[in-house]
């Protein structure tokens, strides 16, 4: 299935949660922190300004991004988990 976000929305594939600590201990599902970074898999066309001008997106497919802990809406498509969020919910692009 091909996902195409609308307007200034971005679809992000979150990074997998850590399975074990640096010391080698396994983390149970209830103790795992949700990752706050992931890879952009789709972007919308951009936001329309009050003047009617289309503002281009600053993120692109393939960018690794950092976002807030509670950013976006979680969705599952064909067994894969994604986050749909506005571009303004993204804090930074990781190099």
Swiss-Prot record:
Pfam families documented for this protein: Cpn10 (PF00166)
Disulfide pairings: none
Record-level Gene Ontology MF annotations: ATP binding; metal ion binding; protein folding chaperone; protein-folding chaperone binding; unfolded protein binding
GO cellular component terms, A-Z: cytoplasm
Example of a GO biological process term: chaperone cofactor-dependent protein refolding
The keyword Cytoplasm belongs to this UniProt entry's keyword annotation: yes
Keyword Metal-binding: no
CDD domains documented for this protein: cpn10 (cd00320)
UniProt entry keywords in alphabetical sequence: Chaperone, Cytoplasm
Gene3D superfamilies the UniProt entry points to: GroES chaperonin
InterPro entries according to UniProt: Chaperonin_GroES, Chaperonin_GroES_sf, Chaprnonin_Cpn10_CS, GroES-like_sf
Cellular location(s): Cytoplasm
Family, per entry: Belongs to the GroES chaperonin family.
Quaternary structure, from the entry: Heptamer of 7 subunits arranged in a ring. Interacts with the chaperonin GroEL.
Function summary: Together with the chaperonin GroEL, plays an essential role in assisting protein folding. The GroEL-GroES system forms a nano-cage that allows encapsulation of the non-native substrate proteins and provides a physical environment optimized to promote and accelerate protein folding. GroES binds to the apical surface of the GroEL ring, thereby capping the opening of the GroEL channel.
Protein name: Co-chaperonin GroES
Encoding gene, per UniProt annotation: groES
